[in-house]
Amino acid sequence: MAGLVVGVIAIPLGMAFAIASGVKPEYGIYTTIIAGVLISLLGGSKFQIGGPTGAFIPILFGIVMTYGFENLLIAGFLAGIILTLMGIFKLGSLIKFIPKPVTIGFTAGIAVIIFVGQVPNFLGLSGVEKHEEFINNVKEIFMHIQSMNMYSVLTAGICLLAVLGTPRFFPKIPGPLIGIICSTLVATFLFPGQVATIGSTYGEIPNNLPQFKFPEITLDRIQLLIRPALVIAMLGAIESLLSAVVADGMSGSKHNSNKELIGQGVANIITPLFGGIPATGAIARTATNIKNGAVSPVSGVVHGIVVLLVLVLFAPYASKVPLASMAPILMVVAWNMSERHLFFNMVKIKTTDSLILVITFLLTVFENLTSAVEVGLILAVLLFIKRMSDTIVTEKVLPNPNNKHQQVDSRVVTSTHDCPQISIYNVEGPLFFGAAQTFEQSIIGTTHSKPKVLLLRMGQVPLLDTTGESYLSNIVHHFSKHGLVLISGIKPQPKTLLIKTGLYEVIGKDHFFDHTGVAIDYALEQLNRNKCLGCKHFAFRECSALSGELTKGIEERRRAFSS
């Protein structure tokens, strides 16, 4: 039953997505059949329903307008290879690292493009030329608004009412199907020949699958299409894995991300060989599949078979469907996929995420999806690096004399309370390429007295990369000219890197300590006693002690930490 219901829903959506992508409607049906069956059989989710989706419309339409239909098939084929490789190399989990502002931004942009792109069909405008650029398509609408066909508006209005009203009164019946049937009957019998139909625009829909044909793939074509293919693959991966997560939440199952990508990849490799367009997991159809009692991938296979039977038996009737009936279906899809609440909430908070969101959205609408994704990701990475670099804190500290445990504190360091021979710095945050220079300047720029000992407290440094190690090496070599460097509390990852680079041996194994207190005791042993005479800073409790008493105190504290 689930496969039958989803198959009925998929037919009008497949044709609508194909038309909006700039290709004949039958190619959407071919995609629904072939990709739908393969994704169900080979994917990593038991309930996934695959096929053409709205997210692909702008990128596919752009490829068709710029490179032609055959190159669209090649781009889809390349995207399938990329998806398969992503699954083989277990990159499925990496998709979750794509920032939410980027995905919401381009999804909202796609929704706007789809919605505005259907206005001419909704209004029945004649003489409208399709352009790849959004702004030119808007101009076309205003230039031809006087050609509005009220019969088309009436047809589209009937379909829209059916699409919106059917779920409310008859929740088990697919709204798009009822909308198409009702509006087609009205247009056919009440005002025949007054509105453009699929048949009058694209010709009759054949009632059989196309023959196998391998596209002519050359190195030049690969270089030409690799960028849009990458975007198709990324969009397909995001959509399919998001759909699989939704299915997991509804069914209590657990999908296999990498297997899902392999299934999506194989489907997109084979589908273009039969004239199909790129496909991915469809969230709405997958949810419908589960709601109607699906228990296995068989429902997805049945959905493809149902579409095939409809193609064979009822293709001539599909040619009579008005284009005005397709428009409201796609408009509702655009409205539902826009994530408008998340979009406006993220804009309201006015953070760097808001900036990423708006820029990605605007580039999607006014430039192209490829540029939008590239710029959005680069901007997100740069702003993330900036935020992470701001988290590094390097403060000069001393033991707090008012704390019985002698914990260090930056507030007790003053011009009259600071040891000239020992400098202690508390380092907090990831020490990576974005923060390394700030770290170095914070230490070298504030140690004016050339201390004999530099103690770095690195217990709050979770990460050290090679750039951070390089700047730490600069500090070590700078201070080794007149003293030594001690490090306390270092974490496993930074320590492992220092061992690999050799800096651990340069600093010296004996100069690494688990506890700051023991490191301070060691530092006190290295002091030039003559410089301590007459010193008024009293940075440490031991400063007022005699040399023999000092040594005795050090040994006692060592025993206390080792016990």
PLM segments and residue spans:
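Transmembrane helical cores of multi-pass ion-transport proteins
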Residues: 1-402
